UniProtKB/Swiss-Prot annotation:
<keyword id="KW-0999">Mitochondrion inner membrane</keyword>
<comment type="subunit">
    <text>The cytochrome bc1 complex contains 11 subunits: 3 respiratory subunits (MT-CYB, CYC1 and UQCRFS1), 2 core proteins (UQCRC1 and UQCRC2) and 6 low-molecular weight proteins (UQCRH/QCR6, UQCRB/QCR7, UQCRQ/QCR8, UQCR10/QCR9, UQCR11/QCR10 and a cleavage product of UQCRFS1). This cytochrome bc1 complex then forms a dimer.</text>
</comment>
<dbReference type="GO" id="GO:0005743">
    <property type="term" value="C:mitochondrial inner membrane"/>
</dbReference>
<keyword id="KW-0349">Heme</keyword>
<feature type="binding site">
    <location>
        <position position="201"/>
    </location>
    <ligand>
        <name>a ubiquinone</name>
    </ligand>
</feature>
<dbReference type="InterPro" id="IPR036150">
    <property type="entry name" value="Cyt_b/b6_C_sf"/>
</dbReference>
<keyword id="KW-0249">Electron transport</keyword>
<keyword id="KW-0479">Metal-binding</keyword>
<feature type="binding site" description="axial binding residue">
    <location>
        <position position="182"/>
    </location>
    <ligand>
        <name>heme b b562</name>
    </ligand>
</feature>
<dbReference type="InterPro" id="IPR027387">
    <property type="entry name" value="Cytb/b6-like_sf"/>
</dbReference>
<keyword id="KW-0830">Ubiquinone</keyword>
<dbReference type="GO" id="GO:0045275">
    <property type="term" value="C:respiratory chain complex III"/>
</dbReference>
<feature type="transmembrane region" description="Helical">
    <location>
        <begin position="320"/>
        <end position="340"/>
    </location>
</feature>
<dbReference type="InterPro" id="IPR048260">
    <property type="entry name" value="Cytochrome_b_C_euk/bac"/>
</dbReference>
<comment type="similarity">
    <text>Belongs to the cytochrome b family.</text>
</comment>
<feature type="transmembrane region" description="Helical">
    <location>
        <begin position="288"/>
        <end position="308"/>
    </location>
</feature>
<feature type="binding site" description="axial binding residue">
    <location>
        <position position="196"/>
    </location>
    <ligand>
        <name>heme b b566</name>
    </ligand>
</feature>
């Protein structure tokens, strides 16, 4: 008798995706982050669901409802901090996952890559709207500053901003709709994840060498299920340590002050995972230029497949390209640091240099070095 997992209509899909899936035998730990992102999404949806049961999306009670969750709800503090720090873990895994794709040339799977970019935007939008919900000072002013950027769009900018706000400033209508979208988007993300996996399983996984591995495949289970479980344990341990020992390490103390439209905080800044993009935005003196640079800093990922000039897929055997890749990583870390600093000398200048270097590395230096490597190998 054939095993039920191979014949049952529903189990067959799961089997072909997670059990009998032919997988390259050489995958390193860098391939763990996809499954870790799945765990992050599950944790966020579960904790978020329970938080939503006690949260009220009204400007007069939102801040107090979060306080109530932390003080009066059984393990409410745990739910709240798991959700807040879970978002940080989500973005750490997300950036490492994208970085892996860049390093090993996974972007040549165009459909998978493009759905991944849409997912990145969706997760960023969800996180931004979630940060507004506690209705602290940074929630309110962060929402005001970021939504106000849309007013830089010619002709329709002002109307667009007021349409999003649902009034003439960030207020009750804004908070209510942000809560609605923050609740809805994770389920849309879940659907997109399935499409992402669907496209990935059409082509099969890439591997560290970048060379087709059709002749050397192993089943996903038990080899990679065990490997993924180790990843889960490491990530969940890290998250637990963060939540239980320093839950506010990555947050902003200003968000413990209730939102006050009459009092602007000295330094308005988003959560740490958006600081690199915020630094790029601030480094351009023109409002519209800054907004375009902000969007392009992420959207640039979409044109990376077109900029691939190397005859090799992966950077594994390309030391010069590796140097540029790590230069880009260092540049992004510099931008993250700058995004959290006040707008004054020398931070403005460092931010401008780092922003130029970011676009220069991706658009010009990487394709140029790849072509040079081809020449050196007489290809």
């Amino acid at each position: 008798m054939t095993n039920i997992r191979k014949t049952h209509p529903l189990l067959k899909i799961i089997n072909n995706s997670f059990v009998d899936l032919p997988t390259p035998s050489s995958l390193s730990s860098w391939w763990n982050f996809g499954s870790l992102l799945g765990v992050c999404l599950a944790v966020q949806i579960m904790t978020g669901l329970f938080l939503a049961m006690h949260y009220t999306s009204d400007t007069t009670t939102a801040f107090n409802s979060v306080t109530h969750i932390c003080r009066d709800v059984n393990y409410g503090w745990l739910l709240r901090y798991l959700h807040a720090n879970g978002a940080s873990m989500f973005f750490i895994c997300l950036y490492l996952h994208v970085g892996r794709g860049l390093y090993y040339g996974s972007y040549t799977y165009l459909e998978t890559w493009n759905i991944g970019i849409i997912l990145l935007f969706a997760v960023m939008a969800t996180a931004f709207m979630g940060y507004v919900l506690p209705w602290g000072q940074m929630s309110f002013w962060g929402a005001t500053v970021i939504t106000n950027l849309l007013s830089a769009i010619p002709y329709i900018g002002t109307e667009l901003v007021q349409w999003i706000w649902g009034g003439f400033s960030v207020d009750k209508a804004t908070l209510t709709r942000f809560f609605a979208f923050h609740f809805l988007l994770p389920f849309i993300i879940s659907a997109l994840v399935m499409v992402h996996l669907l496209f990935l399983h059409e082509t099969g996984s890439n591997n560290p060498t970048g060379i087709p591995s059709n002749s050397d495949m192993i089943p996903f289970h038990p080899y990679y299920t065990i490997k993924d479980i180790l990843g889960f344990l490491i990530m969940l341990t890290t998250l637990s340590l963060l939540v239980l020992f320093s839950p506010d390490l990555l947050g902003d103390p200003d968000n413990y002050i209730p939102a006050n439209p009459l009092n602007t905080p000295p330094h308005i800044k988003p959560e740490w995972y958006f600081l690199f993009a915020y630094a790029i935005l601030r480094s351009i003196p023109n409002k519209l230029g800054g907004v375009l640079a902000l969007v392009l800093s992420i959207l640039i990922l979409a044109i990376i497949p077109m900029l691939h000039t190397s005859k090799q897929r992966s950077m594994m055997f390309r030391p010069t390209s590796q140097f540029l890749f790590w230069l880009l990583v260092a540049d992004l870390l510099t931008l993250t640091w700058i995004g959290g600093q006040p707008v004054e000398y020398p931070y403005i200048m460092i931010g401008q240099v780092a922003s130029i270097l970011y676009f220069l590395t991706i658009l010009i230096l990487m394709p140029l070095i790849s072509t040079m490597e081809n020449q050196m190998l007489k290809w």
